Amino acid sequence: LSVRSRVAKAAGGAARFASRALGRGSGGMIGGEVAMRISPKFLSELAAPYSSVIVTGTNGKSTTTRMVRAALESAGPVASNINGDNMTSGVITALMQGRGATRAALEVDEMHVPAVAADVNPAVFVYLNLSRDQLDRVGEIGSVERRLRDGASAHPDAIIVANCDDPLIVSAAADNPNVVWVAAGAGWGGDSAAYPRGGRVVRSGEDWHLIPAFDGEALPELSARPKPQWWLEDVELAPEGPRATLRGPDGISVRLELKLPGRANLGNAAQAVAAAVAMGIDPAAAAAAVSSVTEVAGRYSVHDVN
Protein backbone atom coordinates (compact mmCIF):
# COMPACT_ATOMS: atom_id res chain seq x y z
CA LEU A 1 0.00 0.00 0.00
CA SER A 2 1.07 3.59 -0.61
CA VAL A 3 1.65 5.86 2.39
CA ARG A 4 -1.70 7.53 1.80
CA SER A 5 -3.49 4.19 1.66
CA ARG A 6 -1.77 2.99 4.83
CA VAL A 7 -3.09 6.09 6.59
CA ALA A 8 -6.52 5.41 5.09
CA LYS A 9 -6.46 1.83 6.35
CA ALA A 10 -5.58 2.92 9.89
CA ALA A 11 -8.27 5.60 9.91
CA GLY A 12 -10.87 3.23 8.49
CA GLY A 13 -10.05 0.62 11.12
CA ALA A 14 -10.35 3.23 13.86
CA ALA A 15 -13.72 4.38 12.53
CA ARG A 16 -15.00 0.81 12.44
CA PHE A 17 -13.81 0.19 16.01
CA ALA A 18 -15.45 3.41 17.23
CA SER A 19 -18.74 2.51 15.55
CA ARG A 20 -18.81 -0.87 17.25
CA ALA A 21 -17.66 0.48 20.63
CA LEU A 22 -20.36 3.17 20.63
CA GLY A 23 -23.08 0.75 19.60
CA ARG A 24 -23.70 2.54 16.32
CA GLY A 25 -23.51 -0.57 14.17
CA SER A 26 -21.06 -3.20 12.93
CA GLY A 27 -18.83 -0.64 11.25
CA GLY A 28 -19.12 -2.52 7.98
CA MET A 29 -19.77 0.65 6.00
CA ILE A 30 -18.19 3.53 7.95
CA GLY A 31 -14.70 2.02 7.93
CA GLY A 32 -14.70 1.81 4.16
CA GLU A 33 -16.24 5.27 3.76
CA VAL A 34 -13.51 6.89 5.85
CA ALA A 35 -10.71 5.02 4.08
CA MET A 36 -12.08 5.91 0.65
CA ARG A 37 -12.32 9.62 1.52
CA ILE A 38 -8.66 9.67 2.48
CA SER A 39 -7.36 7.60 -0.45
CA PRO A 40 -9.57 7.32 -3.58
CA LYS A 41 -7.27 4.57 -4.91
CA PHE A 42 -7.46 2.60 -1.70
CA LEU A 43 -9.72 -0.19 -2.98
CA SER A 44 -7.61 -0.95 -6.05
CA GLU A 45 -4.44 -1.11 -3.93
CA LEU A 46 -6.11 -3.13 -1.19
CA ALA A 47 -7.64 -5.65 -3.62
CA ALA A 48 -4.49 -6.24 -5.68
CA PRO A 49 -3.22 -9.28 -3.69
CA TYR A 50 -6.61 -11.03 -3.75
CA SER A 51 -8.10 -13.49 -6.21
CA SER A 52 -11.73 -12.43 -5.93
CA VAL A 53 -15.24 -13.64 -6.71
CA ILE A 54 -17.98 -11.00 -7.13
CA VAL A 55 -21.53 -12.25 -6.50
CA THR A 56 -24.48 -10.16 -7.68
CA GLY A 57 -28.14 -10.36 -8.67
CA THR A 58 -31.54 -9.40 -7.31
CA ASN A 59 -32.09 -12.40 -5.03
CA GLY A 60 -29.71 -14.78 -3.26
CA LYS A 61 -26.58 -12.61 -3.12
CA SER A 62 -25.87 -13.03 0.59
CA THR A 63 -26.63 -16.75 0.61
CA THR A 64 -24.53 -17.49 -2.47
CA THR A 65 -21.65 -15.36 -1.19
CA ARG A 66 -21.72 -17.29 2.09
CA MET A 67 -21.64 -20.55 0.12
CA VAL A 68 -18.75 -19.38 -2.07
CA ARG A 69 -16.87 -18.31 1.02
CA ALA A 70 -17.37 -21.73 2.62
CA ALA A 71 -16.12 -23.48 -0.51
CA LEU A 72 -13.05 -21.26 -0.85
CA GLU A 73 -12.23 -21.72 2.84
CA SER A 74 -11.46 -25.36 2.09
CA ALA A 75 -8.20 -23.98 0.62
CA GLY A 76 -7.42 -21.29 3.20
CA PRO A 77 -8.62 -18.02 4.76
CA VAL A 78 -11.11 -15.91 2.78
CA ALA A 79 -12.07 -12.24 3.03
CA SER A 80 -15.81 -11.67 2.72
CA ASN A 81 -18.50 -9.11 3.54
CA ILE A 82 -20.49 -11.64 5.52
CA ASN A 83 -23.04 -9.15 6.88
CA GLY A 84 -24.29 -8.03 3.47
CA ASP A 85 -22.52 -4.64 3.33
CA ASN A 86 -22.50 -4.86 -0.44
CA MET A 87 -21.61 -1.40 -1.69
CA THR A 88 -18.09 -0.10 -2.29
CA SER A 89 -17.41 0.89 1.31
CA GLY A 90 -18.56 -2.52 2.57
CA VAL A 91 -16.25 -4.29 0.13
CA ILE A 92 -13.35 -2.16 1.38
CA THR A 93 -14.09 -3.06 4.99
CA ALA A 94 -14.26 -6.76 4.11
CA LEU A 95 -10.85 -6.70 2.44
CA MET A 96 -9.37 -4.69 5.32
CA GLN A 97 -10.38 -7.52 7.66
CA GLY A 98 -8.98 -10.28 5.46
CA ARG A 99 -5.85 -11.00 7.46
CA GLY A 100 -3.88 -13.85 5.92
CA ALA A 101 -6.39 -14.28 3.09
CA THR A 102 -5.47 -14.44 -0.59
CA ARG A 103 -9.03 -15.09 -1.83
CA ALA A 104 -12.17 -13.01 -1.44
CA ALA A 105 -15.89 -13.75 -1.80
CA LEU A 106 -17.62 -10.40 -2.26
CA GLU A 107 -21.32 -9.65 -2.40
CA VAL A 108 -21.82 -6.56 -4.58
CA ASP A 109 -24.99 -4.56 -5.18
CA GLU A 110 -26.03 -4.75 -8.84
CA MET A 111 -25.61 -1.03 -9.47
CA HIS A 112 -22.11 -1.02 -7.99
CA VAL A 113 -20.72 -3.92 -10.01
CA PRO A 114 -18.88 -1.91 -12.71
CA ALA A 115 -17.23 0.45 -10.20
CA VAL A 116 -16.23 -2.26 -7.72
CA ALA A 117 -15.02 -4.61 -10.46
CA ALA A 118 -12.86 -1.85 -11.96
CA ASP A 119 -10.87 -1.74 -8.71
CA VAL A 120 -11.10 -5.37 -7.58
CA ASN A 121 -10.43 -6.95 -11.02
CA PRO A 122 -12.22 -10.18 -10.08
CA ALA A 123 -11.25 -13.60 -11.35
CA VAL A 124 -14.89 -14.72 -11.31
CA PHE A 125 -18.30 -13.04 -11.47
CA VAL A 126 -21.43 -14.88 -10.32
CA TYR A 127 -24.60 -13.55 -11.99
CA LEU A 128 -27.65 -14.98 -10.24
CA ASN A 129 -30.93 -13.46 -11.47
CA LEU A 130 -32.62 -10.14 -12.21
CA SER A 131 -36.11 -8.85 -11.41
CA ARG A 132 -37.67 -5.51 -10.53
CA ASP A 133 -36.62 -4.42 -7.05
CA GLN A 134 -36.14 -1.07 -5.30
CA LEU A 135 -37.20 0.88 -8.39
CA ASP A 136 -36.81 4.17 -6.53
CA ARG A 137 -33.08 3.47 -6.14
CA VAL A 138 -31.94 1.37 -9.09
CA GLY A 139 -34.48 2.27 -11.77
CA GLU A 140 -35.88 -0.03 -14.44
CA ILE A 141 -34.63 -3.58 -14.87
CA GLY A 142 -33.09 -2.77 -18.26
CA SER A 143 -30.68 -0.32 -16.66
CA VAL A 144 -29.60 -2.96 -14.15
CA GLU A 145 -28.98 -5.48 -16.94
CA ARG A 146 -26.88 -2.86 -18.71
CA ARG A 147 -24.76 -2.34 -15.58
CA LEU A 148 -24.05 -6.05 -15.30
CA ARG A 149 -23.32 -6.25 -19.02
CA ASP A 150 -20.84 -3.38 -18.71
CA GLY A 151 -19.22 -5.02 -15.69
CA ALA A 152 -18.70 -8.30 -17.54
CA SER A 153 -17.53 -6.82 -20.84
CA ALA A 154 -14.91 -4.67 -19.09
CA HIS A 155 -13.24 -7.86 -17.78
CA PRO A 156 -12.90 -10.25 -20.74
CA ASP A 157 -10.39 -12.43 -18.88
CA ALA A 158 -12.78 -13.06 -15.99
CA ILE A 159 -15.03 -16.11 -15.80
CA ILE A 160 -18.76 -15.36 -15.62
CA VAL A 161 -20.76 -18.02 -13.77
CA ALA A 162 -24.22 -17.17 -15.11
CA ASN A 163 -27.72 -18.54 -14.64
CA CYS A 164 -28.81 -19.70 -18.10
CA ASP A 165 -32.45 -19.99 -16.96
CA ASP A 166 -32.77 -16.20 -16.59
CA PRO A 167 -32.86 -14.43 -19.99
CA LEU A 168 -31.80 -11.10 -18.47
CA ILE A 169 -28.70 -12.71 -16.98
CA VAL A 170 -27.96 -14.41 -20.30
CA SER A 171 -28.10 -11.01 -22.00
CA ALA A 172 -25.79 -9.50 -19.38
CA ALA A 173 -23.20 -12.27 -19.72
CA ALA A 174 -23.42 -13.11 -23.43
CA ASP A 175 -20.58 -10.86 -24.67
CA ASN A 176 -17.97 -12.37 -22.34
CA PRO A 177 -15.80 -15.10 -23.92
CA ASN A 178 -15.54 -17.10 -20.67
CA VAL A 179 -19.09 -17.87 -19.55
CA VAL A 180 -19.93 -20.92 -17.44
CA TRP A 181 -23.66 -21.56 -17.79
CA VAL A 182 -25.50 -22.99 -14.77
CA ALA A 183 -29.12 -24.18 -14.77
CA ALA A 184 -29.98 -22.52 -11.47
CA GLY A 185 -33.72 -22.04 -11.97
CA ALA A 186 -35.85 -19.32 -13.50
CA GLY A 187 -37.86 -18.11 -10.51
CA TRP A 188 -40.04 -15.11 -11.39
CA GLY A 189 -40.06 -14.66 -15.17
CA GLY A 190 -42.43 -11.75 -15.65
CA ASP A 191 -39.63 -9.19 -15.86
CA SER A 192 -37.86 -11.00 -18.69
CA ALA A 193 -40.72 -11.23 -21.19
CA ALA A 194 -38.89 -8.71 -23.37
CA TYR A 195 -35.24 -9.44 -24.15
CA PRO A 196 -32.90 -6.43 -23.81
CA ARG A 197 -31.18 -7.16 -27.13
CA GLY A 198 -34.42 -7.58 -29.09
CA GLY A 199 -37.22 -10.10 -29.34
CA ARG A 200 -39.66 -11.59 -26.88
CA VAL A 201 -39.09 -14.57 -24.59
CA VAL A 202 -41.17 -17.72 -25.08
CA ARG A 203 -40.88 -20.36 -22.36
CA SER A 204 -41.42 -24.10 -22.77
CA GLY A 205 -40.77 -26.03 -19.59
CA GLU A 206 -37.20 -25.34 -18.52
CA ASP A 207 -36.22 -24.01 -21.95
CA TRP A 208 -36.79 -20.59 -23.48
CA HIS A 209 -36.20 -19.02 -26.86
CA LEU A 210 -36.76 -15.69 -28.58
CA ILE A 211 -39.28 -14.71 -31.23
CA PRO A 212 -39.49 -11.35 -33.03
CA ALA A 213 -41.56 -8.78 -31.17
CA PHE A 214 -42.71 -7.36 -34.52
CA ASP A 215 -42.52 -8.35 -38.17
CA GLY A 216 -38.99 -8.15 -39.53
CA GLU A 217 -37.24 -7.73 -36.18
CA ALA A 218 -33.76 -9.25 -36.22
CA LEU A 219 -32.92 -11.53 -33.30
CA PRO A 220 -29.57 -11.51 -31.47
CA GLU A 221 -27.00 -14.21 -32.17
CA LEU A 222 -27.78 -15.94 -28.88
CA SER A 223 -31.53 -16.39 -29.25
CA ALA A 224 -32.27 -19.36 -26.97
CA ARG A 225 -31.37 -20.73 -23.56
CA PRO A 226 -27.69 -21.74 -23.60
CA LYS A 227 -26.88 -25.36 -22.88
CA PRO A 228 -25.88 -25.56 -19.21
CA GLN A 229 -22.46 -26.84 -18.18
CA TRP A 230 -23.73 -27.39 -14.62
CA TRP A 231 -27.20 -28.74 -13.82
CA LEU A 232 -29.16 -30.46 -11.06
CA GLU A 233 -30.62 -33.96 -11.15
CA ASP A 234 -32.61 -36.08 -8.68
CA VAL A 235 -33.92 -33.03 -6.83
CA GLU A 236 -35.59 -33.88 -3.52
CA LEU A 237 -37.15 -31.21 -1.28
CA ALA A 238 -36.69 -33.16 1.94
CA PRO A 239 -37.91 -31.82 5.34
CA GLU A 240 -34.35 -31.63 6.62
CA GLY A 241 -33.20 -29.68 3.58
CA PRO A 242 -33.17 -29.87 -0.23
CA ARG A 243 -30.99 -32.47 -1.91
CA ALA A 244 -29.78 -33.02 -5.46
CA THR A 245 -26.98 -34.37 -7.59
CA LEU A 246 -25.00 -31.61 -9.26
CA ARG A 247 -23.54 -32.52 -12.65
CA GLY A 248 -20.72 -30.54 -14.22
CA PRO A 249 -18.16 -30.54 -17.01
CA ASP A 250 -15.79 -33.47 -17.57
CA GLY A 251 -18.11 -35.89 -15.80
CA ILE A 252 -18.26 -34.06 -12.48
CA SER A 253 -20.98 -35.45 -10.23
CA VAL A 254 -21.28 -34.30 -6.61
CA ARG A 255 -24.02 -34.55 -4.03
CA LEU A 256 -25.64 -31.48 -2.48
CA GLU A 257 -27.42 -32.02 0.84
CA LEU A 258 -28.21 -28.52 2.04
CA LYS A 259 -29.00 -27.35 5.55
CA LEU A 260 -30.71 -24.25 4.13
CA PRO A 261 -34.35 -24.65 2.98
CA GLY A 262 -35.91 -24.20 -0.43
CA ARG A 263 -35.47 -25.10 -4.09
CA ALA A 264 -33.94 -21.69 -4.80
CA ASN A 265 -30.99 -22.46 -2.55
CA LEU A 266 -30.12 -25.51 -4.66
CA GLY A 267 -29.66 -23.10 -7.57
CA ASN A 268 -27.56 -20.80 -5.39
CA ALA A 269 -25.48 -23.79 -4.31
CA ALA A 270 -24.96 -24.91 -7.91
CA GLN A 271 -23.59 -21.51 -8.88
CA ALA A 272 -21.45 -21.36 -5.74
CA VAL A 273 -19.85 -24.73 -6.52
CA ALA A 274 -19.27 -23.73 -10.15
CA ALA A 275 -17.59 -20.51 -9.00
CA ALA A 276 -15.40 -22.34 -6.50
CA VAL A 277 -14.32 -24.87 -9.14
CA ALA A 278 -13.46 -21.94 -11.44
CA MET A 279 -11.21 -20.72 -8.60
CA GLY A 280 -9.41 -24.07 -8.46
CA ILE A 281 -11.33 -25.75 -5.63
CA ASP A 282 -11.98 -29.51 -5.80
CA PRO A 283 -15.65 -30.10 -6.75
CA ALA A 284 -16.31 -32.60 -3.95
CA ALA A 285 -14.74 -30.30 -1.35
CA ALA A 286 -16.76 -27.36 -2.68
CA ALA A 287 -20.03 -29.32 -2.56
CA ALA A 288 -19.37 -30.54 0.98
CA ALA A 289 -18.53 -27.03 2.17
CA VAL A 290 -21.60 -25.50 0.53
CA SER A 291 -23.79 -28.22 2.06
CA SER A 292 -22.45 -27.39 5.53
CA VAL A 293 -23.75 -23.79 5.57
CA THR A 294 -26.46 -23.48 8.24
CA GLU A 295 -27.17 -19.73 8.39
CA VAL A 296 -26.42 -16.51 6.55
CA ALA A 297 -25.86 -13.44 8.75
CA GLY A 298 -28.56 -14.73 11.09
CA ARG A 299 -30.98 -15.78 8.35
CA TYR A 300 -32.20 -19.38 8.56
CA SER A 301 -30.74 -19.71 12.07
CA VAL A 302 -32.63 -21.95 14.50
CA HIS A 303 -33.16 -21.00 18.14
CA ASP A 304 -34.63 -22.99 21.01
CA VAL A 305 -37.12 -20.85 22.96
CA ASN A 306 -38.30 -21.98 26.39
What are these regions (language model features)?
Residues T63-S80:
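A conserved segment at the C-terminal end of the G1
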Residues L106-D133, S171-R255, A297:
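Extended acidic/charged loop-beta regions that coordinate divalent cations
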Residues P239, P249, P261-R263, A274-N306:
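Gly/charged, well-structured mid-domain segments that form the phosphate/adenylate-handling core
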Residues L135-S143:
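Glycine/threonine-rich flexible loop motifs
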Residues L128, V161, L232, N268, ...:
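Residue-level signal for inorganic ion chemistry
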Residues L1-T56, S74-A75, G84-T93:
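Short, basic phosphate-binding NTP loop
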Residues A101, P122-A123, D157:
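Proline-aspartate-enriched helix->loop->beta-strand connector
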Residues H155-I159, N176-N178:
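A short helix->loop->beta-strand "cap" motif at the edges of active sites that frequently abuts
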